[in-house]
Amino acid sequence: MAGLELSGLAGKVAVVTGRGRMRSIGRSIAVEMARAGCDVVVTGTGRAPENYPDDEKTAGWRDIESVAEEVEATGQRALAVVSDVSDPASVEALTAQVLGEFGRVDFIVNNAGAARGPDRVPVVDLAIDDWMKVIRVNLTGTFLMSHFFG
């Protein structure tokens, strides 16, 4: 992030959700937090490689594993965890795994978002199931992460 310098993160632990895409803002957040001295847990839904866009396939991208490697390249610890932020059991399991590995969490970055295409239509054309997915990930997911890690 050009022009932005983070401070006060040395020795802290962060969980960044929804950062499996190569062009995700979550990727930049995770890497910059690591550069500032933060250990980072990165989460995503674990997309299958056949669902990667062409630029990710060409680059040899591996979803959250690639970002975890970028975090580790800064000298910080990283943990990549496949997790569905909209599912209470998944978030509870994530919480247990992260606390077991790091002992605490100092920051949650609720970056996961479901807006990927089917919901980008006039509201009268929007399928109810597509709307409900957006609500589950964007709203309920943020609540669950804050609730379990809070």
Name what the model sees in each region.
Residues 8-47:
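Canonical Rossmann dinucleotide-binding motif of NAD(H)/NADP(H)-dependent dehydrogenases/reductases
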Residues 38-66:
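Conserved glycine-rich Rossmann-like NAD(P)H-binding loop of the short-chain dehydrogenase/reductase
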Residues 61-62, 82-94, 128:
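The beta1-alpha1 cofactor-binding region of Rossmann-like NAD(H)/NADP(H)-dependent oxidoreductases
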Residues 69-88:
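Rossmann-fold cofactor-recognition segment
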Residues 111-119:
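Conserved NAD(P)H cofactor-binding loop of Rossmann-fold oxidoreductase domains
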Residues 119-123, 127-132:
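Substrate-binding pocket helix/loop in short-chain dehydrogenase/reductase
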Residues 146-147:
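A short, exposed helix-loop element centered on a Lys and neighboring polar residues
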